[in-house]
């Protein structure tokens, strides 16, 4: 029996590059075993709504073949089914003076935000700075260890996991046939982007019994 679109499962996983470097891990116990534990990380099972792009294509394809309780190690995912190949047009050059105007200290290897994009400074010299906006894992084949822990059946729990994935901040409550998202809380003065609201609303109304979503901001 395979996983179908709209089913929500919880998984634990370890993601590695092909040379063995861990780039993501969901289990606190496993992180300690691997020597990569950090207190800053929120370790917990990862929700995956099948068919909605919660994980990379190659991993979702494998999850579709698995059942609750299944686990598999060293799932080999080629770059084209992970974060794609590296694209030369995502490496751009800027005058260093533009960063100095913003009082940004430019150092090779640092992550930097330019407009709405985040990239890595790969070189500087002659008054110019080159920034690579490719995903850090683009062009790399990846290896995953994954275990399917649970299939979420209850609609309220399902909605809570979708909320955590799509929005993450605020409170969620339930009325008959309706979900209320309260984002008007201390420390979160930014609005939820309209595209995020749209995705959340579509996933809720398509994959749970709830017919309406109300946002309070």
Description of each model-found segment:
Residues 1-217:
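FKBP-type peptidyl-prolyl cis-trans isomerases
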């Amino acid at each position: 029996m395979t996983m179908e679109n709209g089913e929500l499962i919880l998984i634990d996983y370890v993601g590695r590059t092909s040379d063995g470097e861990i780039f993501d891990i969901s289990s606190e116990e496993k992180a300690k075993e691997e020597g990569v534990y950090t207190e800053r990380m929120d370790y917990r099972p990862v929700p995956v709504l099948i068919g909605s792009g919660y994980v990379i294509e190659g991993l979702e394809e494998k999850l579709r073949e698995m059942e609750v309780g299944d686990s598999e190690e060293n799932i080999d995912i080629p770059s084209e089914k992970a974060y794609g190949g590296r694209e030369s047009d995502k490496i751009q050059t800027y005058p260093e003076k533009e960063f100095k105007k913003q009082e940004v200290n430019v150092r090779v290897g640092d992550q930097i935000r330019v407009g709405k994009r985040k990239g890595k400074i790969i070189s500087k010299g002659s008054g110019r700075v080159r920034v690579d906006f490719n995903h850090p894992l683009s062009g790399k084949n990846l290896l995953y260890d994954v275990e399917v822990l649970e299939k979420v059946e209850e609609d309220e729990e399902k909605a809570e996991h979708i909320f955590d994935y799509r929005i993450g901040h605020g409170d969620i409550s339930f009325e008959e046939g309706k979900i209320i998202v309260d984002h008007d809380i201390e420390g979160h003065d930014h609005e939820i982007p309209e595209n995020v609201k749209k995705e959340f609303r579509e996933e809720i109304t398509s994959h749970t019994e709830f017919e309406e979503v109300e946002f309070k901001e």
